[in-house]
From Swiss-Prot:
Binds 1 zinc ion per subunit. This is 7-cyano-7-deazaguanine synthase. It catalyses: 7-carboxy-7-deazaguanine + NH4(+) + ATP = 7-cyano-7-deazaguanine + ADP + phosphate + H2O + H(+). It comes from Rhodopseudomonas palustris (strain TIE-1). Keywords: ATP-binding, Ligase, Metal-binding, Nucleotide-binding, Queuosine biosynthesis, Zinc. Pathway: Purine metabolism; 7-cyano-7-deazaguanine biosynthesis. The lineage of its organism: Bacteria, Pseudomonadati, Pseudomonadota, Alphaproteobacteria, Hyphomicrobiales.
Length: 237
């Protein structure tokens, strides 16, 4: 479960969702110490931030090694992002596909802003490794999730901070089924069950409906991707 090859600290973008929880486990297997950062940007699914605390408690319960490695959990509030965005994640509007081929859940610049804030915090704390759950395999087409975007931002951050920043994206080329499998490989059934029960993906913040893959409305793009991945993972496809 654990690789002690690194004596460094990593900062994980940890929203409380499936992908970021899996990335947290990935980081705990590779770094000597791991801190987490989450963002309150006025999202409709603010419930995800409440899930973070339960997930962190769950990680500590799964492994004493993980418990020892987990460091500070940071939460930053960025209200301006909702003020300048007109999307289904920050407004009470129906989720729909836009004329540009992107769903209206796309929050322009969100990951760019998150990674800039994460890098600024990491700089203050002497951290040069940042881990995020961006992926361009099973995703909604968001341009700020693409590998070329992340690589360009890594270069910009390294230049702007005058130190070598590494942006790790362990899910970039994994589909959702492979993401479930990665959780299994890293933490066994205990981690898979924790992610099913206590992570949150649904864009609408629905926690009343329980499915095999966890909680959610079952209809939004995030729920559909998570459900499809679970079915493929569980059936061994």
């Amino acid at each position: 479960m654990t690789d002690h090859s690194s004596d460094k600290t990593a900062l994980v973008l940890f929203s409380g969702g499936q992908d970021s929880a899996t990335c947290l486990a990935w980081a705990l297997a590779r770094f000597a110490r791991v801190e987490t950062i989450g963002f309150d940007y006025g999202q409709r699914h603010l419930i995800e931030l409440e899930c973070r605390a339960r997930l962190l408690d769950g990680f500590r319960a799964i492994s004493d090694d993980w418990a020892a490695k987990l460091g500070d959990n940071h939460t930053l509030t960025i209200p301006t992002l909702a003020e300048i965005s007109d999307t289904a994640l920050t407004r009470d509007v129906a989720i729909a596909m836009g004329a540009d081929g992107l769903p209206n859940t796309f929050v322009p610049g969100r990951n760019l802003i998150f990674l800039n804030f994460a890098a600024a915090l990491a700089y203050r704390r002497g951290i040069t490794d940042i881990v995020g759950g961006m992926c361009e395999t099973d995703y909604s087409g968001y341009p700020d999730c693409r590998n070329d975007t992340i690589q360009a931002l890594q270069t910009a951050l390294s230049l702007g901070m005058a130190r070598d920043i590494t942006l790790h994206t362990p899910l970039m080329w994994r589909d959702k089924a492979a993401t479930w499998q990665l959780a299994q490989d890293l933490g066994g059934d205990a981690l898979v069950d924790l992610i099913r029960e206590d992570s949150h993906t649904c864009y609408l913040g629905e926690r009343g409906a329980r499915h095999d893959w966890g909680y959610g409305c079952g209809e939004c793009p995030a729920c559909r991707l998570r459900s499809k991945g679970w079915i493929e993972y569980a059936s061994g496809i």
